[in-house]
């Protein structure tokens, strides 16, 4: 049973509240807390000069600022602390604050706890954003007032009082957001699981444990959707507290969705033929099947079919840019893990020229080399992980006794130039980094946009 938001309003009024992080996603939260009568202090590692006008904007509405390198040293004396998702709860500063009586939470935890609408939560290693968008589009097509947020869209907590019981909310949830959750969405999905974010999580086990929080606090009338083709997620059925639906690309599924004789079906009913889908790759068929399971109780087959056959994808996800001199360019900048890059490679019918490399999340690249060596014509590497990826591929090339040209570059511009020079008519060039962007770019969108700008200037 969800709590009435009036309880939160009564709780937060006059409280001393610390908000850690003044990033774009936290700014609406800070302003909303001020509106609710809290005495807010905002903390950030950046200095005033780097934050820009937002620092003055917040001070004008009565927010105190704690800025600079040692900003977390001053977390004492607060009733409530909203932490940024990527910051671990076991940091000494948070442990000390909690021992002193502070209530430590996050925007997403409070949102799910008090949101009056039905909440659909999507997590997993790959396919989260596309599946979140598909679920959103299907619900919207059916006529529901639908909100989308979490890792995509806009922060929703500040809009919670506009939401009603007959509305629908679709959330993309990361392992960081889920780590401290003690509340779960009513309808939850884990798309798949593979090693990721091991630069933040202690190990893969902790990463999986965090993902499980998406269903750990469900009730008996809630729904969990699992990937039958993924051993890890398939095995979670025994831990489910409510109903379970599964989806599969390779097996017949009667209690869920599957691909059967090139037809996408849900609960034995045909939705559409795979040849009529706009999205590229089998991984996107899996995303559609997962979405069907999530919305099955709320959406007609007609609405599912409309979205499946009309939705053409999300930016930076196997996104076709242009064809130049018979060479096709694709932007898959979202691919920040080896498994996501492998899924992208599998969506092409011939070996490609791959541009990869980036920030090191401490995850192995051997699975990408093992699964992708025969899908790559030329490998162009850049970023912090360039030598690590090269080493993984050189081992496989030696073992398999095959050939692949590997080129090391120092910038995106150089990567595109090398790819363009080496490409022949009919080739495919794709940016699918298998890594996060933080060594060279603030986020994957900026990385993808630079790639597109360079390609469009050829």
UniProtKB/Swiss-Prot annotation:
UniProt-annotated location(s): Cytoplasm
MF terms (GO), sorted A to Z: ATP binding; UDP-N-acetylmuramoylalanine-D-glutamate ligase activity
The protein's annotated pathway: Cell wall biogenesis; peptidoglycan biosynthesis
A biological process term (GO) from this entry: cell wall organization
Reaction(s) catalysed by this chain's protein: UDP-N-acetyl-alpha-D-muramoyl-L-alanine + D-glutamate + ATP = UDP-N-acetyl-alpha-D-muramoyl-L-alanyl-D-glutamate + ADP + phosphate + H(+)
Keywords: ATP-binding, Cell cycle, Cell division, Cell shape, Cell wall biogenesis/degradation, Cytoplasm, Ligase, Nucleotide-binding, Peptidoglycan synthesis
Single GO cellular component term: cytoplasm
Alphabetized InterPro entries for the sequence: Mur-like_cat_sf, Mur_ligase_C, Mur_ligase_C_dom_sf, Mur_ligase_cen, MurD
Residues that bind ATP: 124-130
Enzyme Commission designation: 6.3.2.9
Transmembrane annotation, as ranges: none
Function: Cell wall formation. Catalyzes the addition of glutamate to the nucleotide precursor UDP-N-acetylmuramoyl-L-alanine (UMA).
Protein family according to the UniProt entry: Belongs to the MurCDEF family.
Full protein name: UDP-N-acetylmuramoylalanine--D-glutamate ligase
């Amino acid at each position: 049973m969800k709590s009435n938001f009036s309880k939160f309003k009564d709780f937060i009024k006059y409280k001393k509240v610390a908000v850690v992080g003044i990033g774009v996603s936290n700014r609406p939260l800070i302003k909303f807390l001020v509106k609710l009568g809290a005495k807010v202090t905002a903390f950030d590692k950046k200095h005033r000069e780097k934050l820009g006008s937002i620092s003055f904007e917040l001070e004008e509405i009565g927010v105190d600022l704690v800025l600079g390198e040692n900003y977390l040293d001053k977390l004492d004396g607060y009733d409530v602390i909203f932490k940024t998702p990527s910051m671990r709860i076991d940091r000494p500063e948070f442990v000390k604050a909690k021992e002193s009586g502070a209530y430590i939470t996050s925007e997403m935890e409070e949102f799910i706890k008090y949101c009056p609408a039905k909440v659909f939560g999507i997590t997993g290693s790959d396919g989260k954003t596309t599946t979140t968008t598909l679920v959103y589009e299907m619900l919207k097509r059916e006529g529901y007032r639908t909100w989308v947020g979490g890792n995509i869209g806009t922060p929703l907590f500040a809009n919670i009082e506009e939401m009603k019981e007959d509305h629908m909310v679709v959330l993309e949830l990361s392992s960081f957001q889920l780590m401290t959750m003690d509340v779960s969405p009513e309808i939850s999905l884990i798309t798949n699981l593979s090693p990721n974010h091991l630069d933040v999580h202690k190990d893969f086990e902790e990463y999986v444990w965090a993902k499980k929080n998406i269903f750990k606090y469900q009730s008996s009338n809630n729904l969990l959707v699992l990937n039958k083709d993924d051993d890890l997620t398939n095995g979670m059925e025994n831990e489910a507290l409510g109903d379970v639906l599964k989806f599969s690309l390779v097996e017949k599924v009667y209690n869920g969705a599957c691909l059967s004789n090139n037809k996408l079906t849900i609960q034995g009913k045909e939705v559409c033929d795979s040849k009529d889908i706009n999205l590229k790759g089998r991984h996107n068929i899996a995303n559609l099947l997962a979405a069907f399971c999530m919305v099955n109780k709320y959406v007609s087959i007609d609405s599912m079919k409309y979205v499946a056959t009309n939705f053409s994808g999300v930016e930076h996800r196997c996104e076709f840019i242009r064809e130049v001199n018979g060479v096709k360019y694709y932007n898959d900048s979202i691919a920040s893990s080896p498994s996501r890059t492998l899924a992208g490679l599998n969506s092409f019918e011939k070996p490609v020229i791959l541009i990869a490399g980036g920030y090191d999340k401490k995850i192995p690249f051997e699975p990408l080399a093992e699964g992708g060596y025969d899908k790559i014509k030329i490998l162009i590497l850049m970023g912090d992980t360039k030598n690590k990826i090269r080493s993984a591929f050189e081992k496989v090339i030696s073992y398999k006794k095959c050939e692949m040209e590997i080129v090391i570059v120092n910038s995106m511009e150089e990567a595109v130039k090398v790819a363009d020079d080496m490409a022949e008519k009919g080739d495919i060039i794709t940016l699918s980094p298998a890594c996060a962007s933080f060594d060279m770019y603030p986020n994957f969108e900026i990385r993808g946009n630079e790639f597109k700008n360079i390609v469009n200037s050829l």
